[in-house]
Amino acid sequence: MSGKPVLHYFNARGRMECIRWLLAAAGVEFDEKFIQSPEDLEKLKKDGNLMFDQVPMVEIDGMKLAQTRAILNYIATKYDLYGKDMKERALIDMYTEGILDLTEMIMQLVICPPDQKEAKTALAKDRTKNRYLPAFEKVLKSHGQDYLVGNRLTRVDIHLLELLLYVEEFDASLLTSFPLLKAFKSRISSLPNVKKFLQPGSQRKLPVDAKQIEEARKIFKF
């Protein structure tokens, strides 16, 4: 039996993508079992594989882990991407929460009701430009290192890179005023494991399209 982690999710970004990113950055190969129908999801539930009847779920080290943050915490700890002490870990957690907040805001736009789309898009752009990106630009300036925390790669660097790439897809002009973040994006993107994950043919998922959204609605009933 393969010793690789096995990821159970829909064949799209969603809440699994940050997990894919972190595993790839750690140089960990993984397999994926895609949920392609309501029956696939129901079988996982009936077999007792989903603690809260939800995905993402990752099989790793004999466990079936649910909840995105719990999975990320385990991977980061296992592969030494969680800082060198409690203070670094606290900073990593704080920065990560902000990153995930903005990531969620941007990703939710694709399933936003049409009558709310304009207002929510404007809010996401405002939060990106005036709250979140300035905060991380300030961190990079004050810390003065190649990384957000300490002087080596941690999970939060990968989470921030993923976010910056989403921002670039969303509206590339939002990055214009943040030279340190642009340099950070280039720097982290050039790391060997990350560079490999960014290449065509990797397990990185493309932006979701209308067909995928419709398929996901049928499976997950949202």
Curated annotation (Swiss-Prot):
**Compartment list:** Cytoplasm
Q: Which residues carry this modification: N-acetylmethionine?
A: 1
Question: What sequence ranges are listed for the domain GST N-terminal?
Answer: 3-83
Q: Could you name the Gene Ontology cellular component terms for this entry?
A: cytosol
Keyword Electron transport tagged: no
Supply the EC number(s).
Answer: 2.5.1.18, 1.11.1.-, 5.3.3.-
Q: Where is the GST C-terminal domain?
A: 85-208
Q: Which PROSITE patterns match?
A: GST_CTER (PS50405), GST_NTER (PS50404)
Q: Which residues bind glutathione?
A: 9, 45, 54-55, 67-68
Catalytic activity reads:
RX + glutathione = an S-substituted glutathione + a halide anion + H(+); prostaglandin A2 + glutathione = prostaglandin A2-S-(R)-glutathione; prostaglandin J2 + glutathione = prostaglandin J2-S-(R)-glutathione; (13S)-hydroperoxy-(9Z,11E)-octadecadienoate + 2 glutathione = (13S)-hydroxy-(9Z,11E)-octadecadienoate + glutathione disulfide + H2O
Q: State the family named in the UniProt similarity comment for this chain.
A: Belongs to the GST superfamily. Alpha family.
Q: How does it assemble?
A: Homodimer. Homodimer or heterodimer of GSTA1 and GSTA2.
Q: Briefly, what is this protein's role?
A: Glutathione S-transferase that catalyzes the nucleophilic attack of the sulfur atom of glutathione on the electrophilic groups of a wide range of exogenous and endogenous compounds. Involved in the formation of glutathione conjugates of both prostaglandin A2 (PGA2) and prostaglandin J2 (PGJ2). It also catalyzes the isomerization of D5-androstene-3,17-dione (AD) into D4-androstene-3,17-dione and may therefore play an important role in hormone biosynthesis.
> What is this protein's name?
Glutathione S-transferase alpha-1
Name the source organism. Answer: Rattus norvegicus (Rat)
Phylogenetic classification of the source organism: Eukaryota, Metazoa, Chordata, Craniata, Vertebrata
Gene name linked to the record = Gsta1
